[in-house]
């Protein structure tokens, strides 16, 4: 098992180059199953989750070559079953089911794993596939789906906004007969990116980025070349890291348009923000942040994936604040670890009451999920003393070379084997 050892009290200053989006790469990689032709995917982040996705594609029978780009040819897929040993660590594997079903008429996926953040059921994914004509069976820990002939169009009204289910239904509907309508669809940039990828292969999709998406099914998709959008959560994480360290940072190869609410909250905290077409500059030199009120909600609201990082900001800010988590009911696993570091916070229902302190202190902490890991690492960078962060598996799932990027802006961080 690996751990980070971080010597804190460092001002983080410099340049960071942002990787491709984890949350767009995964559905796009699995959507390559829909095509029989070679596809080149650019800007795929080198992280554990994309490694697992590529491993699963190869298991199914796809040819995958890895260089600066990922080259995938799913023509010869002959296995439609994703076993437990391949998908148990990655919840995103459910996104393979829709493409398998749409192209081959069948598919089965072991109920997936990943971060244990509350109750993340796949019910909405399966509801959508049933509406498209699939028969669904749950047996021995597996989701099994089949359809006679092709999937057919449907009007699908989501009773809850779901990024994952929107992606599943949209991908499957690209090869369905007729026009499928998804109402109350999620609007996240990663959904837009996945739709743009599918459109580049010949899919007919309209309304993406709104709450109603229209998909006119086609018989087949072609090959192509596509570049993944930048990771907005990685960008936000480094911006917060600089802000809490009273530093100055420029993030390159990013997209400011996907971070409007995050940049607004950083500005409220006292940061000076400048933006360009593909860069963001934050200046918090020698300024202590002000506490900001946070309430997570679906895009374009404040992203739940930035909640833990802003918790750290509020814990070292002037004043007190409330963070309300509206997406996941158990996304507070960072709180007990931050309290070990001297943070003052109380959880009541879905709220975190944060009380700013002058200084966090080094401690031995455990990264219990991906964004907890990120929050503890950036907290360690500013804490007085030595912080050790255990269970790096989670951070490696979602952040590409995070320790090297932090070192480049002044962090004293080492990866050690226990």
Swiss-Prot record:
PANTHER family: UDP-N-ACETYLGLUCOSAMINE 1-CARBOXYVINYLTRANSFERASE (PTHR43783:SF1)
Keyword Transferase tagged: yes
Functional note: Cell wall formation. Adds enolpyruvyl to UDP-N-acetylglucosamine.
Official protein name in the record: UDP-N-acetylglucosamine 1-carboxyvinyltransferase
Protein species of origin: Wigglesworthia glossinidia brevipalpis
Assigned protein family: Belongs to the EPSP synthase family. MurA subfamily.
Record GO terms (molecular function): UDP-N-acetylglucosamine 1-carboxyvinyltransferase activity
Alphabetical UniProt keywords: Cell cycle, Cell division, Cell shape, Cell wall biogenesis/degradation, Cytoplasm, Peptidoglycan synthesis, Pyruvate, Transferase
Entries under InterPro entries matching the protein: Enolpyruvate_Tfrase_dom (IPR001986), Enolpyruvate_Tfrase_sf (IPR036968), MurA_subfamily (IPR050068), RNA3'P_cycl/enolpyr_Trfase_a/b (IPR013792), UDP_GlcNAc_COvinyl_MurA (IPR005750)
Keyword Cell cycle listed: yes
Subcellular location: Cytoplasm
Residues reported in the UniProt entry to bind UDP-N-acetyl-alpha-D-glucosamine: 91, 120-124, 305, 327
Gene3D superfamilies in UniProt: Enolpyruvate transferase domain
Catalytic site: 115
CDD domains recorded: UdpNAET
